[in-house]
């Protein structure tokens, strides 16, 4: 099981975004069933309240970077996402299904009871890279609050040969007063020289774009642009 303040899934057919407000969080559980079991047959009980998993979030059937959502199919493995208040406000929680139940581990309940926190985010990327060389996006996340927290972001790309495409999602758990850095690289093809592409990084409280021009490929060792005698 995992605890996340937001989840990442499609918000359009060709882009991803984060879902979840400051006073919300998600409990994510991967399940495998031997017979048909509807998502609504699963319940989470905590603090006298009963919660059912979200059957749909955004426009997608998958949660980045976890995997496909669970639907009622015999022998299927997938993820269910319970939308819960943040903090949970309960010292225990139980996941139940027809014929069984499981008490959540203490570490999971502790994570669900964390207070919301705030992050300062800095995004850097080169202005240009040679074709066939990696362009690295660097995201620095500083936890400016008083509680440990998980930062969630989503990365999309436009160009050089696609109009819009999801790249990946990131989750960083950062202690109060600490800073962590996440990096992601994309390597343009040699035939993309002269074009450009854009990283679009989004999170709950903001978004940043970085356009990167693509230069001619660098010459490999031993190659020369002119003959000599």
At which residue positions do the language-model features occur?
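Conserved functional micro-motifs across diverse proteins
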Residues: 1-152, 161-181, 185-229
């Amino acid at each position: 099981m995992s605890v996340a303040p937001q989840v990442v899934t499609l918000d359009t057919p060709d882009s991803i975004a984060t879902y979840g407000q400051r006073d919300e969080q998600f409990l994510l559980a991967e399940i495998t069933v031997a017979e048909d079991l509807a998502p609504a047959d699963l319940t989470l009980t905590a603090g006298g309240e009963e919660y059912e998993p979200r059957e749909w979030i955004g426009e997608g059937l998958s949660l980045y970077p976890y995997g496909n959502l669970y639907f009622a199919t015999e022998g299927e493995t997938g993820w269910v996402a319970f939308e819960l208040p943040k903090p949970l406000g309960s010292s225990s929680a139980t996941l139940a299904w027809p014929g069984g139940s499981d008490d959540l581990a203490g570490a999971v309940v502790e994570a669900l009871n964390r207070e919301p926190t705030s992050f300062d985010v800095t995004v850097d990327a080169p202005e240009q890279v040679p074709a066939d060389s990696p362009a690295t996006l660097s995201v620095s996340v500083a936890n400016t609050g008083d509680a440990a927290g998980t930062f969630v972001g989503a990365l999309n790309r436009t160009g050089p040969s696609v109009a819009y495409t999801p790249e990946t999602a990131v989750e960083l758990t950062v202690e109060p007063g600490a800073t962590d850095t996440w990096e992601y690289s994309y390597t343009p093809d040699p035939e993309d020289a002269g074009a450009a592409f854009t990283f679009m990084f989004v999170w709950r409280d903001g978004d940043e774009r970085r356009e990167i021009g693509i230069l001619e490929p660098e010459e490999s060792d031993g190659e020369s642009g002119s003959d000599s005698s």
